[in-house]
Amino acid sequence: MNFELKTLSLAAAAAYKCDLLVVLVPEGFLPGSDVLSTLTAHALKQGDLEVKPGKLLQCYAPAGVAARRVVLLGCGAADAHAVRQAMQALAPSFKLPSVKRVALVFGTSAQRGAIGAAVRAVSDGSYVYTATKTKAEPRALLRVTLGVPDAGAAQPEFATATAVAAGVEFAREWANRPANHATPTLVANAAKTLAKYPGVQCQVLGPTEVAKLGMGAFLAVAQGSDQPLRLVELRYNGAARTQAPVVLVGKGITFDTGGISLKPAAEMDEMKFDMGGAASVLGVFRALAELRPAINVVGLIPACENMPDGKAVKPGDVVTSMSGQTIEILNTDAEGRLVLCDALTYAARFKPAAVVDIATLTGACVVALGGLRSGLFASDDLLAEQLLSAGDAALDPCWRMPLDDEYAEGLKSNFADMANVAGRAGGSITAAKFLQRFVGDTPWAHLDIAGTAWKGGAAKGATGRPVGLLVHYLLERATVSTVKPKQKTRSRKSVA
């Protein structure tokens, strides 16, 4: 599917040949004398159309319009949230076999973020998973034209939106694949395909190299599986070599049975989505390759399965992480933090400006925040503010959670430097406190996407989040023209 941006008035849109012409009608719509304006004004006057987001009126082959079908679509304030809500009402239309060309015309100047919301809505709504289906109909929609009053002014937002859409789709594709079609090796191969883009490099380490690095926690999780682990290292070089990179670390558990601490059978199939963090890193690099921002980024993906086996790690086992710290594994189903802790230690070799890890880490975060916002934990206030702002801009929001030092008390162990779990209470926070022990003084953030990486039920499938958040964050960093002094790490202290 291709997107294109054109300067297109309502008068010109009437002559545009397509299968579906969507006219976004905002509050305070001011009609002109053209046929589409007249049609819209008449529908509003008669009460057949409301400007409330998502309210629509379908017209088939109206006189003077070249499109086969016209939809007048209310979009309220025409901001990003309203446009997304409006476009979601049209999602079924984007999958119709008869709809191959769509034109989307803004009835007024688009507010900031509205174009991105429209592009993402069309991309998400038309997405079709086909990788393991023999009779699936491929995506019918081939071309989407966005008509705006001034295409030149809208071009930067449009470029970002289409790149993010491509990245989100790449992430969804790999997170959706069944575990036997997305093994650690296959995920690593997907990362290698990104190296075809200018500025992107990829290196993959196997069990032997990982063992030499001393990644005992990562190795412990992988030892119960016949599928060999992979440590993927992606690099995007868009700035001078002297510029410190941002390191993204994505949890890559390609299937999580829980190990010896076996999960319940119900909905265990959804544990193929446990590599949502890894998929988001792949998606971010797909977008970076298209946007080519002036920034250096490293992506790390520790990929393996968590399986029960005679060789599997057992509750009570003590392992030595790459950092040298020992860990008592009280629950083998708390494996994500084990693979991440070694990858976070490895990240230090790049002398990063900031580290952000992304993981479907805890059910506790789902309980706390549901499926709307990802959980954000950060050791640095400025980094937290940047990620919160990026999430809002991308309509991919997160919510900052506490990191009081007292939450780490439950990680104490009689037999190791720390345990890998600290009980049920505050589970998402104690998991973040565990990870914090492996990042030193580097500005660090942890995104718990357990509630946002996929949807269950009839709409089961990966969402591609938080690719949008991360891309917007990186683009904002890239726009900073001067190198700011390194921010001092600030942990939240107890208020008691």
Curated annotation (Swiss-Prot):
Function: Presumably involved in the processing and regular turnover of intracellular proteins. Catalyzes the removal of unsubstituted N-terminal amino acids from various peptides.
Residues involved in Mn(2+) 1 binding: 256, 333, 335
Record: residues binding Mn(2+) 2: 251, 256, 274, 335
Annotated catalysed reactions: Release of an N-terminal amino acid, Xaa-|-Yaa-, in which Xaa is preferably Leu, but may be other amino acids including Pro although not Arg or Lys, and Yaa may be Pro. Amino acid amides and methyl esters are also readily hydrolyzed, but rates on arylamides are exceedingly low; Release of an N-terminal amino acid, preferentially leucine, but not glutamic or aspartic acids
Family affiliation: Belongs to the peptidase M17 family.
Enzyme active site: 263, 337
PROSITE patterns cross-referenced by the UniProt entry: CYTOSOL_AP (PS00631)
EC id: 3.4.11.1, 3.4.11.10
Domain of life: Bacteria
Predominant location: cytoplasm
Name of the protein this chain belongs to: Probable cytosol aminopeptidase
Keywords: Aminopeptidase, Cytoplasm, Hydrolase, Manganese, Metal-binding, Protease
GO molecular function, one term: metalloaminopeptidase activity
